Amino acid sequence: MKYAFFLGCIMPHRYPGVEKATKIVMEELGVELEYMPGASCCPAPGVFGSFDQKTWLTLAARNLCIAEEMGLDIVTVCNGCYGSLFEAAHILHENKEALDFVNEKLDKIGKQYKGTIKVRHFAELIYKDIGVDKIKEKVVKPLDVLNVAIHYGCHFLKPSDVKHLDSPERPKLLEEIVAATGAKPVMYRDYLMCCGAGGGVRARFLPTALDMTKEKIRNMLEAGADCTVNVCPFCHLQFDRGQVEIKEKFGEEYKLPVLHLSQLLGLAFGMKPEDLAVSVHAIPVDPVLKKLGIE
């Protein structure tokens, strides 16, 4: 399997370790990821789409065109990028007026969107195409001592009427992937609540965003979580860097380790922590490594 790898903004600039972890984990699972030359911001659906939908749609379509030129479907590890590109492709498929408008703009840079590719989230790809049985086969370091609080995020499952990935209210997809590593997914209060960062809230109303993050982290800890696992670098940033900001603004310290799903899988596959770049997180992951007996 080969896919066009859409990086987005947060991962390469703030968490390049997630990028590396994704590359080597997917390689282990038989998936080749090829970088997309000239790709831009997705762009962020909650920001661009709110102010100017036509501009958002045109920029997203340009990224889709790059993958079409490569002859590859897109895979991304970011919920926001997935939401933006998937929903743009859906609109362009369903709305000829929007397609004509976008292609008129794209024609000026020598591109045309044809609608020949699909947009995939890497967790969806793992679950639907690779399968949890393959994950189990690849596990060399069972994570059976680890209690994991899963964070789905907002754009992964919704809008559910067009994505059809899983139940938007009682999902199980990530639980099954995490459980395949031997780790125990733990249920906690407000399980599907936003991390607090999305929709421009972090950028404009940081205290409000941190209040939401703080509530989620408290709930995770009360449920006995050793760490939280996400499938979105922006959510990852909010939980990881957000804990530092919570201490600075509210004087409250939590220290809940934060892992992207690719990093959790990498640990289960026996990959070295330094290859997964977990040491560069704002909140130390050492308690997780110590519990797993990893030096």
Swiss-Prot record:
S-S bonds: none
Pathway: Cofactor metabolism; coenzyme M-coenzyme B heterodisulfide reduction; coenzyme B and coenzyme M from coenzyme M-coenzyme B heterodisulfide: step 1/1
Domain of life from the UniProt record: Archaea
Oxidoreductase recorded as keyword: yes
Gene Ontology biological-process entries: methanogenesis
Pfam families with a match to the protein in the record: CCG (PF02754)
The protein's enzyme class: oxidoreductase
UniProt keywords, alphabetically: Methanogenesis, Oxidoreductase
EC number: 1.8.98.-
Molecular function, one GO term: CoB--CoM heterodisulfide reductase activity
Assembly information from the UniProt record: The heterodisulfide reductase is composed of three subunits; HdrA, HdrB and HdrC.
Its job: Part of a complex that catalyzes the reversible reduction of CoM-S-S-CoB to the thiol-coenzymes H-S-CoM (coenzyme M) and H-S-CoB (coenzyme B).
PANTHER family listed in its UniProt record: COB--COM HETERODISULFIDE REDUCTASE SUBUNIT B 1
Family label: Belongs to the HdrB family.
Protein name (database record): CoB--CoM heterodisulfide reductase subunit B 2
Organism from which the protein derives: Methanocaldococcus jannaschii (strain ATCC 43067 / DSM 2661 / JAL-1 / JCM 10045 / NBRC 100440) (Methanococcus jannaschii)
